[in-house]
Structure formats: C-alpha cells, structure tokens
Amino acid sequence: MASQQEKKQLDERAKKGETVVPGGTGGKSFEAQQHLAEGRSRGGNTRKEQLGSEGYQQMGRKGGSTPDKTDKEDAEDEPSTRT
C-alpha cells in the first residue's frame, strides 16, 4: 500500500492528467483511477464468466456480426475450431 506522501504525489500527478494506475485512464484523481481500474477489471472478468472462456475468446476473434447476415450464415462462414 502506498504511504500518505506517495498517495499525495500520485494524486497530484493524476490531477495533471497523468495515468498513475494501470487501467485507470480518465480518472481525475489517484482514488478515482483506482476505482476505474478495479471496475474495468471486474467488468471484464464478469463478462468472461457469463460467456465462458471459449465464448469470450470467440467473441474477441469474431468481433460483431454484420446486419446483412443471420447468425447461422455467420456461423457457416466462420472456420470451425473443433476437431
């Protein structure tokens, strides 16, 4: 855990627009950046749990579906990863 002095220095840097916490981009203070990073991490993990790791990986490879194709047509175009 950061000491009071370190927190104050990090807070000052964050107020100048610097990202001082990985994943805390956009936070206007050290504490705000911590909360943003925690929420982003938790949100990604929750999404992964909902889809399962296989679905999460497929979503990353595939991207969004196109409006001119149905899901079935998209699946037919997708190369099969099963053996």
UniProtKB/Swiss-Prot annotation:
Residues 1-18, 37-51 have a biased composition (Basic and acidic residues). The keyword RNA-binding does not apply. Residues 1-83 are annotated as: Disordered. Coiled coil: none annotated. Its main location: cytoplasm. InterPro entries: LEA_5, Sm_Hydphi_plant_seed_CS, Small_hydrophilic_seed_prot. Induction: By abscisic acid (ABA). One of its GO terms (cellular component) is cytosol. It is found in: Cytoplasm. Residues 73-83 have a biased composition (Acidic residues). This protein may play a role in equipping the seed for survival, maintaining a minimal level of hydration in the dry organism and preventing the denaturation of cytoplasmic components, or may play a role during imbibition by controlling water uptake. This is Late seed maturation protein P8B6.
